[in-house]
């Protein structure tokens, strides 16, 4: 009876250790999500209203982009200096995907429309921690 118990415990331990090892190997290849934050001043509200759907469409169609979460939402300062007039936040499957989009033809083709609508103060990508 004791030997059956020992065999069962050894099998259980082997399965548990194997599961942990497989999970660890899977996590090594996983990319971390990233968020692009764009701070800008609005130059022309009508041009911005036309630009937002265009950039949303380009993000959705290229490089695994997720929707532009906000571009005209309310901004409330908490710490530091004055906030920018407009902030855009978008989610990406990885930092590489985000950078690739902003270097892509789909994005650069929108530059004239963007430059008429907003003046980009700062844009950066933040990779999510593990």
Summary of predicted features, one role per range:
Residues 99-102, 112-116:
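Short, exposed beta-strand-loop hairpins at the edges of beta-sheets
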Residues 10, 104-107:
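Alpha-helix boundary/capping and short turn/kink residues
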Residues 57, 107, 116-119:
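Residue-level marker of structural boundaries
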Residues 115-130:
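C-terminal end-helix/capping segment
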Residues 3, 45, 111, 119-120:
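Short alpha-helical segments used as structural interaction elements across diverse proteins
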Residues 10-20:
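Terminal signal-anchor or tail-anchor transmembrane helices
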């Amino acid at each position: 009876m004791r030997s059956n118990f020992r065999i069962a415990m050894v099998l259980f331990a082997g399965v548990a250790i194997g599961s942990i090892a497989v999970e660890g190997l899977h996590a090594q290849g996983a990319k971390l999500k990233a968020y692009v934050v764009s701070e800008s001043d609005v130059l022309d509200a009508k041009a911005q209203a036309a630009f937002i759907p265009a950039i949303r469409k380009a993000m959705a169609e290229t490089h695994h982009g997720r929707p532009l979460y906000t571009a005209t939402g309310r901004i409330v300062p908490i710490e530091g200096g004055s906030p920018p007039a407009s902030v855009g936040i978008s989610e990406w499957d990885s930092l590489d995907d985000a950078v690739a989009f902003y270097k892509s033809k789909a994005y650069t083709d929108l530059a004239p429309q963007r430059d008429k609508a907003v003046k980009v103060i700062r844009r950066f990508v933040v990779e999510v921690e593990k």
